[in-house]
Amino acid sequence: MFKIQESIFGICPLAFVVFAGVGTSAFTQADSPRPNIVVILVDDLGYSDLGCYGGEIETPYLDGLANEGVRFSQFYNTARCCPSRASLLTGLYQHQAGIGFMTYADWGEGYEGTLNEKCVTLGEALKNAGYTTCVSGKWHVAAHRNPPEHSLPENRGFDKSTVVRTHIDSYWKVLKGCDVYQDGTIVIPGNNNNKSLKNPYHPEKDFYTTEYFTDVALDYVDNALQGSDQPFFLYLAYNVPHFPLEAPDVTIGKYETKFDDPAWIAEYGRGWDEMREKKLARQKALGLVAADQKLPEVSYFNNRKIMPGLQTGFEHNALPKWNDLPENVKQEVLFRRAIYNAQIDNLDENIGRLTDKLKSEGVYDDTLILFMSDNGCSGEMGRFGTHFEGGKYDHTEARFENGKYIPGGVKESGQWPHNDKVGGVGYKKSNYDQWKKASGWATSQGQCWAAYSNTPFRKFKKFVHEGGIATPLIAHWPNGITAQGKIVSKQYFHFMDVMPTLLEVAGAEYPAAYDGRVRTPLEGVSMLPHMQDPNNDSLERLLFWQHETHSAARKGNWKIVTDNDRAESIKWELYNLANDRSETDDVADKHPQVVKELSGEWHDFARRVHVTPFPEKRAKR
């Protein structure tokens, strides 16, 4: 269990000032070189999966970084993979960088589906400031097919790059369409039939993405430190713990054993209901949430189609209670959670390999490490992670007619779990050897466990309620952050704040023009003053979100949010996050003026950054 450190809980008072296009001030320590910078991004990690955020998974290396650095309790992403990466890399809202939705189509400005030329990337800005720049892992900000040259890492400021340009749907294999590129050249071609791929760095070992991307990163660090006085910037973007469920057998077995251990169960509980309660208690003890924080009721979701290539999630019925499940189903879902935990455990081991390398090279204390997730935990494959729920669906698809949402009817049938890919009997613990490397959209832990991963928040990845957009953020820099073990909880921040933070750390300025092109001014603000002083509550700001049909705005403690921003008259929910980050008490009817003001701000934002007109109102280019 993560050691409880001194922490400070609080949320800033209601504020009404907008920060936009903020510049950076140079920051350098006296008689100290500029630090190396490592940004670690993971994929679909829940807010509270890590030990240092109250989770039960063993993450000693990440917990150590938190103990020696600071954690943020109110750090936000954009709710989805590609948009979050675009915001992180550019210091802008995702629409301003060209990726308002995903990378599968071009609907014009704001929705180009690829990184545009109106932004500056972290690679470009830090290379311009004298850093050696490198990226390893998942890129996913280039068009899915025929990406333009200006959207690729080798053309956006990275001296060295080893990436999968698109999504990654396997750990053990490199699937067709998921080729590995090194400096623009394919080095591992995708092949759906390759079941015995080996790690190029360790030919005696099977290929596994987490370990391979770490090997690449270690190689880059090694080369960057040889014969050069330049600091380095490493962007390490893992695909873990995104589905499918794939992890080393020995680590899976470790968690299977724990789930049957009476002492472990006494500390952490058994099943998602009891485990959520115990996790919330740990979060309160750590100072991550308010002492009176409550758990929300959680519901599962299905998708509704807006147009070809664009669908969105909508809530359905409540998730099942653990004690209502038959014992055989409990065993199946515990096994899925064991694999999920093993993926994160393995991630932590690999981050340990990186930090050990930095220590052995004598640069650990003067390297800024940031760790975060691109969105909340995913519930994309049903309640139990089988993709087909109870077997098969008989349903009438939800739809929009004249701006009005018409819910679909869903009726479940069949047996659980079921998937025709394994002889019609489903992906079960008993036949795991047959599907352990199935890859693709094979398996996940399901929405019941995902809700637990997102404790204490509502909803999941894709939504802009807190469960979809709240991410852990760990900042570690012994020579630059002295408030060790503290929690930055009085302010809220966003992915777009990483760019100005790193520029300040590097003593650099944001270029108003790059390669002769005028660039969009920064939207983010530097987090460095708050890393150095977690009590700093001087910042006042307004933030916005929009993804699929989900939208939100936050000003101080007030947050409005909706799952249907296409409605002729949007029904906004309103929450006071000072005492309700779980978003359980909608006070919109009690404070109509707040809703009116914030919704007006959101509409102004939507027009300014090209959220509107929405894609379905445009012609695909």
For the regions a language model picked out, list residue spans one by one:
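Formylglycine-dependent sulfatase
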Residues: 2, 7, 11, 16, ...
